[in-house]
Amino acid sequence: MVDITDDASPAQIKQAIGSAAAHYMQTSIRPNDMVGISSWSSTIRAMVDNLHPLNIKTSGVIQLLGGVGPNGNVQATLLTQSLANILNCPAYLLPAQSIERSTEDRARLISSGEVADVVNKFAEVDLALVGIGVLEPSQLLKIPATITTKRC
């Protein structure tokens, strides 16, 4: 639970939630935990920004969602790697887009070596960090070149 003032801005609310989530994670995570992370959440970004380096080593941080658009993969990589650095562990990056054009494209992608290696690690996740958010798109999805209006 996060206590905020009635006149708190959305940025202040996100900061408060990120700070509380960081505190919870710092007190809950165990050595050798495998952490999965959603890459589209600005609140999770706030949590990572509020974490302090821990004196434990986890098994790894796995990117659970691919990026959307060219900048989406960069953001997902940075968030996953930042958390892995704080947790003193390797980052397992998902080299894929989250949205594919067809189920055939998805099947081809899932069976490719690098993607399959990461997807196979999903079963090892002990703690998954996912943003639930609001109905409107995340600011991370609104970055230019992330979403296009062109129909396929």
Task: Describe each model-derived feature in a short phrase.
Residues 49-53:
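Distinct, well-ordered alpha-helical segments
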